[in-house]
């Protein structure tokens, strides 16, 4: 999980005395490559996806990555460790990057923002439960 960063060990051992309220991160390298390349080159999603496949960053069937499923699974693992709870993957709201256009990227850039596929888990102040979502923002 998280590209070789020892995040699970840090959550289990290094942050054991702390209360974690939120996890936020970029959890899928394929999506990050696609979105970063779209921004840098102005090219459209399909073109950059094809490049990612040619470079071996994306699978022949990239749905697991670009539809956010891989990031959702990673988020569920991190949530389970960080919050000490079992996570049903079906409880994670998931949106992928398949519909992010070069125009979306350009508009975000004009306002000083970068579109990334983020995984976010946080405690719901009202219910006390955990809210999890993966979405481009």
Predicted features along the sequence, with ranges:
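Substrate-binding/catalytic subdomain of NAD(P)-dependent oxidoreductase enzymes
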Residues: 38, 48-137
């Amino acid at each position: 999980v998280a590209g070789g960063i020892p995040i699970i060990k840090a959550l289990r051992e290094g942050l054991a005395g702390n209360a974690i309220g939120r996890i936020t991160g970029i959890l899928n390298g394929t999506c990050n490559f696609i979105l970063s390349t779209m921004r840098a080159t102005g090219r459209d999603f399909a073109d950059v996806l094809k490049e990612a496949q040619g470079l071996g960053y994306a699978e022949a069937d990239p749905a697991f990555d670009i539809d956010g499923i891989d990031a959702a699974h990673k988020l569920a693992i991190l949530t389970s460790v960080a919050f000490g709870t079992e996570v049903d993957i079906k409880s994670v709201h998931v949106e992928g990057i398949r519909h992010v256009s070069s125009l979306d990227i350009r508009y975000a850039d004009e306002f000083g923002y970068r579109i990334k596929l983020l995984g976010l888990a946080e405690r719901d102040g009202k219910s006390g439960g955990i809210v999890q979502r993966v979405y481009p923002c």
